[in-house]
């Protein structure tokens, strides 16, 4: 199979010194991508031509950054990648906001604060938007208004990796992984646990040895995970 590059673009100033994973979102004829400084750009999928862009407001930080991972002056930048669902572009920020934008023109529909930094791209289904934050809390928001519908909290170990699992919604059930080594299935309607499965057991003498984070996206294949 011969593969050729049709087009390529750099989004804004890239990621800078930030340790974040920003996968783009794809919907219809749009590819939506973010940089590490609050810029979100929608490109034509076939030509690479910019269609619209949004720049999120900057927030002044006090104190010093840790190991240069954050700049002193940072926008509320997209921290978990770009999600697509319910006819919207869905992003979470380092300042604990979930923002819903119109796919066609990038206009903001709503934004809701969910607490801490959003660690993965939001997903949507059955009239709700689901988001997971770095404190291992899953929040369900009303897709029309952004109002909080329910939350689910998982007990975190003392030491974890930076990052979270990306929730996946399928047939009324939300699947996601947590820093305690468990994968959990939640009812999309109310957040009630259906089942949980430990995929790794913590072993070792130190907290570092005992890290068992599930940080990857859950993959579903028919009746298997």
Spell out what each predicted region is.
Residues 35-57:
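Beta-propeller domains
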